[in-house]
Amino acid sequence: MSKEEVLEFSGIVTELLPNAMFRVKLENDHEIIAHTAGRMRKNRIRVLAGDKIMVEMTPYDLTKGRITYRYK
């Protein structure tokens, strides 16, 4: 999948789930399940409930996403 096909949204982490998954409420009031990107895991960036984040989603499945950035 190329980079152009990815949709990016901002959201807020509402709940921490098992297996490093998170429930995220997007700006447009949709709720999705997201996991952290590998680069965030490698650099040990912590994501907690209430954090504002950037999520990448594929247009094929709009219920799952990947957390790519945590705002400061």
From Swiss-Prot:
<keyword id="KW-0694">RNA-binding</keyword>
<comment type="subunit">
    <text>Component of the 30S ribosomal translation pre-initiation complex which assembles on the 30S ribosome in the order IF-2 and IF-3, IF-1 and N-formylmethionyl-tRNA(fMet); mRNA recruitment can occur at any time during PIC assembly.</text>
</comment>
<dbReference type="InterPro" id="IPR006196">
    <property type="entry name" value="RNA-binding_domain_S1_IF1"/>
</dbReference>
<comment type="function">
    <text>One of the essential components for the initiation of protein synthesis. Stabilizes the binding of IF-2 and IF-3 on the 30S subunit to which N-formylmethionyl-tRNA(fMet) subsequently binds. Helps modulate mRNA selection, yielding the 30S pre-initiation complex (PIC). Upon addition of the 50S ribosomal subunit IF-1, IF-2 and IF-3 are released leaving the mature 70S translation initiation complex.</text>
</comment>
<keyword id="KW-0963">Cytoplasm</keyword>
<dbReference type="GO" id="GO:0043022">
    <property type="term" value="F:ribosome binding"/>
</dbReference>
<keyword id="KW-0648">Protein biosynthesis</keyword>
<dbReference type="GO" id="GO:0003743">
    <property type="term" value="F:translation initiation factor activity"/>
</dbReference>
<keyword id="KW-0396">Initiation factor</keyword>
<dbReference type="GO" id="GO:0019843">
    <property type="term" value="F:rRNA binding"/>
</dbReference>
<keyword id="KW-0699">rRNA-binding</keyword>
<dbReference type="InterPro" id="IPR004368">
    <property type="entry name" value="TIF_IF1"/>
</dbReference>
<dbReference type="GO" id="GO:0005829">
    <property type="term" value="C:cytosol"/>
</dbReference>
<protein>
    <recommendedName>
        <fullName>Translation initiation factor IF-1</fullName>
    </recommendedName>
</protein>
<dbReference type="Pfam" id="PF01176">
    <property type="entry name" value="eIF-1a"/>
</dbReference>
<dbReference type="InterPro" id="IPR012340">
    <property type="entry name" value="NA-bd_OB-fold"/>
</dbReference>
<comment type="similarity">
    <text>Belongs to the IF-1 family.</text>
</comment>
<feature type="domain" description="S1-like">
    <location>
        <begin position="1"/>
        <end position="72"/>
    </location>
</feature>
